[in-house]
Amino acid sequence: MGPVESVKAYTTQAVHKYIETEDLGVAIVRFKNGALGVIEGSTALYPGLYDRIEIHGENGSVLIENSQIVRWEFKDQEPIDEEIRKNRGLETFELGSSRDPMEIPYELHRREIEDIINCLREGKTPPIDGYEARKAVEIIIAIYRASKTGEEIRLPLTV
């Protein structure tokens, strides 16, 4: 999709009034190429749902649920597409539900940290380095600013 241009967001304490932070957040992300995206996160859902990523465009759609590819369809098929559909492309993990944040396991985070440590030991660059990670953090900060101010927040952020 490319770089993010701006973010508009809303957060609330929909269900868990006893916690110190929001339990529902929705953001609309505008990319520099004009595409729009939606990011939603919640621990206020019943009965508690697993992670879900949807990517849709004029030439195809991908749907990932619980870290497994459920749909992989493109207008123009490539040889690798059938292989991805057959193997589902991703290892499946039991990820717990969004209803109880304590059920969300740490396995994927642990693997990511181990990979970074191994790259440092071997003098390699991690697949996602600190510069790329900062971009994700910048988007998260923009989402919080947008939800707090009610304004559309443009990126890159200024101090």
Where are the regions a protein language model picked out?
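Rossmann-like dinucleotide-binding domain that binds NAD(P)(H)
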Residues: 1-36, 42-48, 131
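Residues at helix-coil transition
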Residues: 2, 118-122, 148
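C-terminal glycine/acidic-rich active-site capping loop/insertion
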Residues: 26, 31, 54, 58-131, ...
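Beta-strand scaffold of nucleotide-dependent catalytic cores
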Residues: 38-41, 64-66
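Short arginine-rich
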Residues: 139-149
